[in-house]
Regions:
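Glycine-rich phosphate-binding loop of ATP-dependent small-molecule kinases
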Residues: 1-218
């Protein structure tokens, strides 16, 4: 059997399993199940989510994408807006620009001390423990590319296709800056990867293998 046919067979079987699991989740009114999708902008975060919208029943899927706090959000505790945006039980939620993003970008750009970052991550861990106590299941994904892919961004005019997705988190940065992002992400993982909400590294140079891997995790 060719590699293409093998992958197609795996994908079809996985889709059936996922649809069955989604039905059972909705029927039991459990969850929600949240997928926090983080990592390199060019690792296919949006494409990964689109794949699950193709595979699953869209009626029970939700996507949350966050920019900087606006309006009343600025007056409330930092994690408040994430709490109030939780999707209902029995559904699956994809989060881009989650509660990790702003502290992570501030640390990687030297705008936040490690002490402050550690304090922020302690708050996040308490928040996630609270979510778990309320029945929420968390799956935290860090999509990464090998060095050849990660360190060679396309020209600005080619980046427009990614900007149009309204899901670009990091903006344009150099190889050195990306190295700092990875260092900050390692620190983040050390502080917040727990039994109930571990960080999972997802190799993303091969999009189809990436999608199958995440689908099996689900």
């Amino acid at each position: 059997m060719s590699k293409h046919k093998s992958l197609k067979k795996q994908r079809e079987a996985l889709c059936e399993d996922l649809l069955e699991a989604q039905f059972e989740l909705q029927k039991a009114n459990l969850g929600p199940v949240l997928l926090l999708v983080s990592g390199n902008d060019l690792a296919g975060k949006a494409e990964l989510i689109y794949t699950f919208y193709e595979w699953l029943d869209n009626r029970y899927l939700n996507t949350r994408a966050f920019t900087l706090p606006q309006g009343i959000e600025r007056k409330m505790p930092r994690l408040w807006r994430y709490w109030r945006s939780l999707p209902p039980a029995g559904t699956l939620g994809f989060y881009l620009g989650s509660w990790y993003h702003q502290p992570l970008i501030q640390l990687s750009r030297g705008r936040m001390s490690d002490t402050r970052f550690k304090s922020e991550m302690e708050q996040v861990t308490r928040f996630e423990n609270q979510l778990a106590a309320e029945g929420v299941t968390l799956l935290k994904l860090w999509l990464h590319l090998d060095d050849d892919h990660a360190q060679h961004y396309p020209p600005r005019e080619q980046q427009k296709q990614y900007d149009s997705l309204a899901m670009r988190e990091w903006g344009e940065f150099s190889t050195t800056e990306y190295t700092k992002v990875r260092e900050a992400a390692k620190r983040m993982s050390e502080l917040t990867s727990t039994t109930i909400a571990p960080w999972i590294q997802v190799a993303s140079s091969d999009a189809e293998a990436r999608d199958l891997y995440v689908g099996k995790l689900l």
